Structures are given as structure tokens and as C-alpha cells.
Design a protein with these regions (language model features):
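Alpha-helical transmembrane segments in multi-pass membrane proteins
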Residues: 3-4, 8, 12, 31-34, ...
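C-terminal ends of transmembrane helices
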Residues: 5-24, 71-85, 134-147, 189-193
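Transmembrane alpha-helix boundary signature
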Residues: 10-20, 36-51, 73, 112-116
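Cytoplasmic-side transmembrane-helix entry/capping segments in multi-pass membrane proteins
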Residues: 19-31, 85-97, 147-156
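Helical transmembrane-bundle signal
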Residues: 32-38, 42, 64-77, 99-109, ...
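Transmembrane helix-loop junctions at the membrane interface of multipass transporters and ion channels
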Residues: 41-49, 111-118, 144, 149, ...
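Loop-to-transmembrane alpha-helix initiation sites
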Residues: 51-62, 123-127, 169-184
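Glycine-rich phosphate/diphosphate-binding loop of Rossmann-like nucleotide-binding domains
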Residues: 77-98, 109, 115-117
Length: 194
């Protein structure tokens, strides 16, 4: 905690004010990624018990993975590394197909983990790959001028993921923090989108 806090403090002191959105995007992505990894570890260890906990773990990992990869794309765009909006042919169909596939695989993980021991590792890997690709594909077509709104939405996603993982771990602090971040990110997104 001290090492991570020290790095974050140092980065916050040296980053230019004009580069603050990029820093927020990266920090937000790390939060979403951490929430997703917590779920992966809990599934791999066989520590997810009951359909409600398994469902929340899958939802948290899906939302956290989307927030992670989407935040990385947002950072790359704001930093000028990824200059053009990338749009796939039939983008909406691809988004829907990836979303349905990730949700379907998540449902399979939930049903295979409840009462059957740890979920198969390959199912988890495939699920995370789908979720990460979904986050990148959803964020790639959006232009740089709209990235602050996207970052705010992804921030709300990270809050939801953290809240779900707090329930999975039985940690009220994570649940409360996730609810606060999710609600404030949603409110900020609505205000910025007007």
C-alpha cells in the first residue's frame, strides 16, 4: 500500500495539469483491472460459493475488465498515441456479439462454479479476453474530445466492479466505496453528456 501510494503521490505531483485526464484514465483502469483480477483469483481458488456471489463476481469481473481496457484506450487517445477513432465494419453488431458472448460465457462460469468446485481455467481466460476486447472495441470509435465523458462513465463502471467484488469478499468498505464511486461517476457522466 505504501509503495502504490508513494508512486501515485509522486505521479500526481509531477504530472502537468493538462495531462490530468490521462492520469485519471490510467488510475481508473487500474482500479477496474484490480477488481476483475480479484474475481479471477476467487474463482480460480474455488472461493466463490453460491449463485448470488458467483453472479456478482462475474459481473464485477466483466465490468472491471471493460473499464480496464476502455481506460487504456482512453489514455492512449488522450496521450496522442492512438490518434484516429477506430471503427469496425458493423461496429454495433460486433459490440452486441461480444457483449452477448461475454454474458453467456459468464453465465456458464456461474453455473459451472456453483457446487462444482473451481471454474475451469480456460473458461476464465476466454471470458476475460472477451471482456477486455469488448472494452477496447466500445471505446475505440469515440473521438478524443469526448474522452472525458467516457472516462467518467468508465469510472462509474469501476465503482460498480469494486462494489460487486466487495460483496464477493464480504468487505463492507469496498461495497461502500464502490457505491460512492459508481454513483458519482454516473452523475458526472450525465452532467457532462448534456
Amino acid at each position: 500500500i505504501v509503495l502504490g501510494g508513494g508512486v501515485a503521490w509522486w505521479a500526481g505531483r509531477v504530472v502537468k495539469m493538462t495531462d490530468m485526464p490521462q492520469m485519471v484514465a490510467i488510475y481508473n483502469g487500474m482500479g477496474g483491472g484490480a477488481a476483475a483480477l480479484i474475481a479471477a483469483v476467487e474463482f480460480a481458488r474455488g472461493e466463490v460459493h453460491g449463485p448470488v456471489v458467483a453472479t456478482l463476481a462475474v459481473l464485477g469481473s466483466l465490468i472491471g475488465s471493460v473499464a480496464f481496457s476502455g481506460s487504456v484506450i482512453a489514455f492512449l487517445k488522450l496521450q496522442g498515441i492512438m490518434n484516429k477513432a477506430f471503427r469496425l465494419p458493423a461496429q454495433n453488431l460486433v459490440n452486441i456479439a461480444l457483449g452477448v458472448a461475454a454474458i453467456g460465457l459468464g453465465a456458464w462460469i456461474v453455473t459451472s462454479s456453483v457446487g462444482a468446485g473451481p471454474a475451469n481455467d480456460w473458461l476464465l481466460v476466454l471470458f476475460f479476453v472477451l471482456a477486455l476486447v469488448l472494452g477496447a472495441v466500445l471505446t475505440s470509435p469515440i473521438g478524443g474530445a469526448n474522452m472525458p465523458v467516457v472516462i467518467s462513465l468508465l469510472n462509474a463502471f469501476t465503482g460498480l466492479a469494486v462494489g460487486f467484488e466487495g460483496y464477493v469478499l464480504g468487505n463492507p468498505t469496498l461495497i461502500i466505496a464502490g457505491i460512492v464511486v459508481g454513483a458519482s461517476g454516473t452523475l458526472l457522466t450525465q452532467l457532462m453528456a448534456k
